[in-house]
Amino acid sequence: MSIEIANESGADVDTDAVLAVARHALDEMGVNQLAELSVLLVDIDYMAELNHRWMGGDGPTDVLAFPMDEGSVDHGPGENAAAGAEPALLGDIVLCPEVAAKQAVTAGHSTADELHLLTVHGVLHLLGYDHAEPEEEREMFALQARLLASWRSTRSR
């Protein structure tokens, strides 16, 4: 699995941990091992610009996900890369550490924990999950919590 990360935010971020949680979520979701993903960390001004341009939102947001091959990605237990399978371009996740830091204070955890949560959230969006409706939100957020808990349990060993 190829995961590229670029920190253009100016914030001190443990990019290895962001990569690890993204890889864990993709592995747990059974995503094809040939899949490609990029993660970009940006400053608050650029995130506000992206949010306005692509989502019609005002101001910055915490995470944006831009799927590429949505729908063609294998995900689910036992659906890892088959011989001769083509790489899947999952897409891009854009994170804003400054927004994450503010949300972390409200949530009562570290900025790193918030960035890990947002990374998993972005991965799930790339895999087609959404939270526009209450039932979708329950499903997505429960899966997000499960993936984070399983990742944290692997790190504490």
Curated annotation (Swiss-Prot):
UniProt keyword annotation of Disulfide bond present: no
Gene Ontology BP term (one): rRNA processing
GO molecular function list: metalloendopeptidase activity; RNA endonuclease activity; zinc ion binding
GO cellular component, one term: cytoplasm
Binding of Zn(2+), residues: H121, H125, H131
Gene3D superfamilies noted in UniProt: Metalloproteases ('zincins'), catalytic domain
Keywords: Cytoplasm, Endonuclease, Hydrolase, Metal-binding, Nuclease, Ribosome biogenesis, rRNA processing, Zinc
Enzyme Commission code(s) on record: 3.1.-.-
Cofactor(s) the protein needs: Zn(2+)
Family: Belongs to the endoribonuclease YbeY family.
PANTHER family: ENDORIBONUCLEASE YBEY, CHLOROPLASTIC
Record-given protein name: Endoribonuclease YbeY
Native source species: Salinispora tropica (strain ATCC BAA-916 / DSM 44818 / JCM 13857 / NBRC 105044 / CNB-440)
